[in-house]
């Protein structure tokens, strides 16, 4: 876990304005938006770490927490992959290129990429949970020689829910072995059927004590992923999850995102499993 | 500075002094059969000659046999309604040709003098200072109000049946965090200054040094409050007790009684949760982002797209109690409870958190 980049000075409620520079449709109901700051100064200062998120604000509609899914070295222009879920994400989907919205961030903790050096790395992503892991994939690819065996296990409800499939071939070629699976098969699908946890169960682990696993997806999926990884001999201190909770402020002041003693917005969203497990495992906490 | 004496007839002079310095006075006053905090104009607005009788789930005003100004304990309000307003604008957005212009709201111009702040309430303000001012992010709304307030504390000379400040080490004596602290005697107040601004105000009032007898009388009056406290919360090991008993059967037991009405969190002087909403003009060109008090007892509080996390009363009551008494310690290095007893008094079904904690100390069947 890493501390926020720097405690925001000034008013944490103030937004920058950003403009939609490009929209790339991904899968049904999901698109990737490239944003640019309207203020060049803000653009020069903005930096994020993989795993962090922004609050996107549509005046009159509301805010939504959205992970950064861009290349971490991106400057001036970066992207978010967003699923239409409710009010804010729907209104956002209505904006075209050139549309302007508010942004606060980046917030929260980040994936421990530096701890992965010299180790095997497994990424387990359920559905849109791949969005916050994509910057990790980019970092791993950019510094491929520093890591051991690299695997991405990506599950979705149906073949149409698999994300960034157009990039999978590049990732494979670059040294991140991508395996996909779906809960429900379809006519044109001859790949794996079952959850990503099934893929993990089958994955050869030459040195579990020297393997790091990062996972993001629905709580149940992360729960079973962690259980399977522990059974396979990965230490709890090398498992990391990215949690999701209702967030209103993103700066530890509104109380909504508490998970036991943790504020998911500040202490998370990325948690080392041994720290969060006593609370993550309790239903309704 | 030695303890000073202010004749009761001169209390208005203190009010005048503070008003003269530009403070709006907020203090206790009787409204709707309770002693609440509201703007007051003069000592005539104080609940003189009234007291409160409290018990789990019950609050009643009764006339006193004397003319005490501050002869009551605490009511349903707390000072957080002035420092952390129930409704506040965080940001305004105006549509422009090229998108949106967003601005912070103007800083408040009014400043308040709080009259009659009790020791547990000073502690509660300190707890909220920690939340809103001393973390990685500072809340500008709270800060603007907190920086400008003047605090006239009052030492308790009696306690309610619901008070347990002695268990939380927050009272009943006002130790710090005030500009002035008063102890009420029958004909006068003993005045202590706790800050430079407090000392300055003292310099402008007709005070004289208190005699040893008067100081002893004040000590005796304050001792009555200590003697009057009967409720106790055992805090030994409380953090681990709560956080390692998340599946204790008592949670289901209390959930069967709790109405999940959120009263306890609304009257709690330290609860800080809020939600943000949008208020738009008819054309949608001017938008205000408004923050409103919220509570972990509301179902929507933990709503996510996939569903509600705390979907039953059991999980919501557990959030309240474990946050207040346990995880608060992890988050802020101190308990979130100051022992004021409001959550006990204002619970419509008389749930008493000290009893719930005691029950959690019993091993489950
Ligand atoms: C740290 C974090 C990272 C996220 N990253 C992404 C991402 O990269 N891509 C993506 O598509 N989605 C992401 N989400 C989920 C996204 O925030 C929600 O889908 C979104 O808030 C739904 O808002 P809405 O107004 O469209 O839906 P509504 O259902 O209308 O939401 C109403 C309100 O409920 C709350 N709410 C509802 N669902 C969620 C939720 N899942 N999480 C938090 N608050 C919620 C919010 O306060 C929201 O304003 C992330 C969530 C978190 C907490
Ligand atoms: S007890 Fe509930 S309402 Fe109060 S601060 Fe904690 S989470 Fe918020």
PLM ranges: what are they?
Chain B
Residues 1-243, 249-251, 271, 282:
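Iron-sulfur-associated redox domains of electron-transfer enzymes in respiratory
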Residues 21, 261, 340:
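Single, functionally critical "micro-switch" positions that shape active/binding sites
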Residues 24, 264, 343:
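Residue-level detector of anion-binding/catalytic polar loops
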Residues 27, 267-268, 346:
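A generic structural-conservation signal
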Residues 255-265:
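Extended amphipathic alpha-helical segments enriched in small hydrophobics
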């Amino acid at each position: 876990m890493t501390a926020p980049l720097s405690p925001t000075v000034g008013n944490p409620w103030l937004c920058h304005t950003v403009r939609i520079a490009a929209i790339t449709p991904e899968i049904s109901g999901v698109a990737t938006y490239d944003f640019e700051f309207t203020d060049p100064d803000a653009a020069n200062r903005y930096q994020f770490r993989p795993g962090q998120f922004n609050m996107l604000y549509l005046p009159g509609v509301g805010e939504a927490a959205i992970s950064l899914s861009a290349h971490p070295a991106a400057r001036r222009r970066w992207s978010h992959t967003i699923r239409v879920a409710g009010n804010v994400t729907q209104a956002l989907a209505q904006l075209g290129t050139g549309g302007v919205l508010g942004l606060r961030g980046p917030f929260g903790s980040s994936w421990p990429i530096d701890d992965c050096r010299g180790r095997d790395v497994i990424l387990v992503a359920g559905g849109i949970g791949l969005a916050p892991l994509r910057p990790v994939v980019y970092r791993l690819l950019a510094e491929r020689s520093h890591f051991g065996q690299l695997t991405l296990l990506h599950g979705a409800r149906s073949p149409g829910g698999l994300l960034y499939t157009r990039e999978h071939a590049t990732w494979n070629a670059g040294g991140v072995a991508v395996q996909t699976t779906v809960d429900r098969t379809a006519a044109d699908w001859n790949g794996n059927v079952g959850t990503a946890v099934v893929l993990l169960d089958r994955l050869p682990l030459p040195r579990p004590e020297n393997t790091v696993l990062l996972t993001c997806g629905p709580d149940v999926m992360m729960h079973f992923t962690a259980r399977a990884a522990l059974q396979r001999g990965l230490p709890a201190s090398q498992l990391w999850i990215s949690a999701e909770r209702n967030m209103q402020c993103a700066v530890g002041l509104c109380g909504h995102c508490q998970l036991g003693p943790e504020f998911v917005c500040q202490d998370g969203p990325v948690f080392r499993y041994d720290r969060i497990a006593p609370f993550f495992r309790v239903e309704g906490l | 500075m030695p303890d000073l004496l202010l004749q009761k007839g001169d209390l208005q002079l203190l009010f005048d002094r503070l008003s003269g310095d530009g403070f709006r006075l907020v203090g206790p006053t009787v409204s709707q059969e309770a002693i609440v905090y509201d703007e007051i104009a003069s000592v005539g607005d104080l609940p003189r000659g009234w007291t409160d009788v409290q018990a789990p789930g019950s609050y009643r005003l009764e006339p006193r046999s004397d003319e005490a100004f501050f002869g009551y304990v605490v009511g349903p309000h707390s000072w957080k309604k002035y420092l952390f307003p129930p409704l506040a604008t965080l940001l305004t957005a105006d549509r422009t040709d090229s998108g949106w212009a967003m601005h912070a709201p103007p800083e408040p111009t009014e400043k308040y003098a709080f009259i009659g702040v009790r020791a547990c309430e000073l502690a509660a303000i300190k707890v909220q200072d920690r939340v809103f001012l001393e973390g990685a992010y500072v809340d500008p709304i709270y800060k603007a109000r907190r920086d400008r307030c003047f605090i006239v504390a009052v030492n308790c000379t009696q306690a309610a049946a619901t008070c347990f400040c002695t268990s939380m080490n927050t009272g009943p004596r006002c130790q710090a965090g005030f500009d002035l602290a008063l102890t009420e005697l029958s004909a006068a107040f003993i005045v202590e200054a706790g800050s430079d601004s407090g000392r300055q105000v003292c310099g402008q009032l007709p005070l004289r040094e208190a005699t040893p007898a008067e100081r002893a009388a004040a000590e005796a009056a304050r001792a009555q409050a200590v003697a009057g406290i009967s409720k106790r919360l055992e805090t030994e090991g409380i953090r681990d007790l709560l956080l390692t008993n998340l599946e204790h059967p008592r949670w289901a037991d209390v959930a069967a009684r709790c109405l999940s009405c959120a009263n306890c969190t609304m009257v709690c002087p330290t609860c800080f949760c809020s939600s943000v909403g949008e208020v738009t003009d008819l054309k949608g060109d001017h938008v205000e982002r408004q923050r409103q008090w919220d509570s972990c007892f509301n179902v929507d509080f933990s709503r996510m797209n996939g569903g509600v996390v705390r979907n039953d009363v059991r999980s919501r009551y557990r959030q309240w109690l474990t946050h207040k008494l346990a995880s608060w310690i992890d988050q802020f290095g101190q308990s979130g409870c100051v022992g004021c007893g409001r959550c006990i008094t204002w619970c419509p079904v008389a749930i008493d958190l000290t009893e719930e904690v005691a029950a959690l100390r019993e091993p489950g069947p």
